[in-house]
């Protein structure tokens, strides 16, 4: 008995995407790498890191140790990117070094744009900026508000500007995260550790400044969502909760740690940490979005501030337990 072979054509499988993450071992970049790894299990992830070494990132990606301003661009031909997540910033510890980093970042980004524009197939680029770019506000702002950078963003703007000005790339998208709540960075340095050290949770200035918050994992989820569901050449505000006052935020921390809250004056803050830090911690930038349907697609894990705090404090306790 002869059987007729099945000649019905089958669709060729879609090629696995290649994602690049610049700043892949940094605070946001590492979270983006993890989100890509979980969402796209068959993708090729090229993680570019500098200074920091992260074993998990090195194990689960094609890891390249490279400086943003001194990069071997032959890697772009070896692993042609479909999308680049730009989470890399040249940092500085004071106004002088931040200004120098800003100039170096500008030169580096101009070179990256030149190299990417010369590829046979241009990738989309998702640049991670921040809501400090919009400056202090009197009411909730949505995407498209004019830039008026304060604090760290005053220095970052120069480095970012080539991506805003370029006509050489066809698709540059923007992520503007609000306050990113995770077990490290500003939360640990300015709230958690001072609370344990001083016996009270600080709030800065009068405490009335409004904070829009997003959990680190939800931040990365939304940044990747800009690639998956976003529109070319569009910027998106990255946040989760309705804005709350910093005093209320401090009180929520105090309730969990069993501590009272107390103010630290803006003058005292500036005297100790400098103008840039003081501007950031006393900033009033409540954000919303004009892209409601995109936002609804994101399915956030921590949509309320109390859930964010519970998760982050649990993560901190886990880290401290491992260190003990």
Outline where the language-model segments fall.
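Amphipathic terminal alpha-helices
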Residues: 2-4, 8, 303-324
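N-terminal Rossmann NAD(P)H-binding glycine-rich loop of SDR-like oxidoreductase domains
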Residues: 13-41
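N-terminal Rossmann-fold cofactor-binding loop
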Residues: 47-53
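NAD(P)H-binding glycine-rich loop region in Rossmannoid oxidoreductase-like domains
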Residues: 53, 57-115
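Catalytic helix-loop patch of NAD(P)-dependent Rossmann-fold dehydrogenases
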Residues: 136-175
